[in-house]
Amino acid sequence: MREIVHLQTGQCGNQIGAAFWQTISGEHGLDSNGVYNGTSELQLERMSVYFNEASGNKYVPRAVLVDLEPGTMDAVRAGPFGQLFRPDNFVFGQSGAGNNWAKGHYTEGAELVDQVLDVVRREAEGCDCLQGFQITHSLGGGTGAGMGTLLISKIREEFPDRMMATFSVVPSPKVSDTVVEPYNATLSVHQLVENSDETFCIDNEALYDICMRTLKLSNPSYGDLNYLVSAVMSGVTTCLRFPGQLNSDLRKLAVNMVPFPRLHFFMVGFAPLTSRGAHSFRAVSVPELTQQMFDPKNMMAASDFRNGRYLTCSAIFRGRVAMKEVEDQMRNVQSKNSSYFVEWIPNNIQTALCAIPPRGLTMSSTFIGNSTSIQELFKRVGEQFTAMFRRKAFLHWYTGEGMDEMEFTEAESNMNDLVSEYQQYQDAGIDEEEEEYEEELPEGEE
């Protein structure tokens, strides 16, 4: 089977990761101790992608939990699914990274990284045919961002031909935890551009908006936000976990989604969005799902795709869905919104189907889009970065850990390059059209 090894680093990564394991354990019919008591053969068929079968009919996640302080780990261990994980796979330091990327990447994190790699190696050796790695982390802090990117580059060195997918929580404009988020995020993106194959961008503000607007929660907790993220993660990985008519794995997804190697930052969405308690009391149809899925309000990253164009996108439908209906809907979306799709990649919507819906729903869909409007997100972080870096504010925290200002300058220019690459492809048309257009302009201008 094509296994995936999952890593979660830092507080945010561990909380999202815990929600993800809770969600998929439920989908595969596992209780909180990893014992199978499901009803469908399909739940077992590809269980081994994420779970290792231990003795006594118990399934153990292929998960490695990493943090530089013990706090979050204790919370995961004490949480509802704490007994699911293999105790040896908790790797933690004592000192914490204090929201400092340099500590996570160069000092504290670097001391712990070999211990983590040992566990990763052990998990990888337990696989028949390892497909790749997925990592959940945030880009704004110290451990998830600094140590997370360190792990990614180390794993890249050791497993150069395996896929690397990241679920990265990007700092959002309104919801900020720390002042130095722009530094940490820019330094992280600098790493992700080079070392990740696909990065799913999630941001807290967009999640808050979805909770308030669509789910009608007046005061959303992190639990509610994590629930949304885990729904998307479950959707993105459905095709890997269940048999379906049209299955894709991480590599197929990348082949279809990444036209240029650096442009692998995706926006994600999910439908139907229903609040946690009220599992929808109405029937859901494919057109409805499609409409909600392409709605800018449902994107989990704070950038509006109407300000850019889609290079590629992928839709994953779950439940009893007719292939033809899905394809018609997709064609429909593309022809209605053709201005939001680049015309130089024909058929740039890819669809996948899976027969098993998430718990409590009859059907659902997950959306993954590679849109040039994601540059808004990087632009925003870049502007905040420049504002602070120009004054060299807070730099001593980083240089004190042995970093060089040069590295900041490089990260900044790499991020600016990324933004202009997205812009370049947003403006690019098909050459012939552009030439005709230029000839027509003079007489038809006024």
Swiss-Prot record:
Task: Please list the GO terms describing molecular function.
Answer: GTP binding; GTPase activity; metal ion binding; structural constituent of cytoskeleton
Q: Where does this protein hold Mg(2+)?
A: 69
Quote the biased-composition stretches of kind Acidic residues, using this chain's numbering: 429-446
**GO CC entries:** cytoplasm; microtubule
Kindly state which keywords UniProt assigns to this record, in alphabetical order.
Cytoplasm, Cytoskeleton, GTP-binding, Magnesium, Metal-binding, Microtubule, Nucleotide-binding
Q: How does it assemble?
A: Dimer of alpha and beta chains. A typical microtubule is a hollow water-filled tube with an outer diameter of 25 nm and an inner diameter of 15 nM. Alpha-beta heterodimers associate head-to-tail to form protofilaments running lengthwise along the microtubule wall with the beta-tubulin subunit facing the microtubule plus end conferring a structural polarity. Microtubules usually have 13 protofilaments but different protofilament numbers can be found in some organisms and specialized cells.
The task this protein performs is described as: Tubulin is the major constituent of microtubules, a cylinder consisting of laterally associated linear protofilaments composed of alpha- and beta-tubulin heterodimers. Microtubules grow by the addition of GTP-tubulin dimers to the microtubule end, where a stabilizing cap forms. Below the cap, tubulin dimers are in GDP-bound state, owing to GTPase activity of alpha-tubulin.
Task: Read off the PANTHER family from this record.
Answer: TUBULIN
Protein name as annotated: Tubulin beta chain
**Organism of provenance:** Gibberella zeae (strain ATCC MYA-4620 / CBS 123657 / FGSC 9075 / NRRL 31084 / PH-1)
Corresponding gene?
TUB2
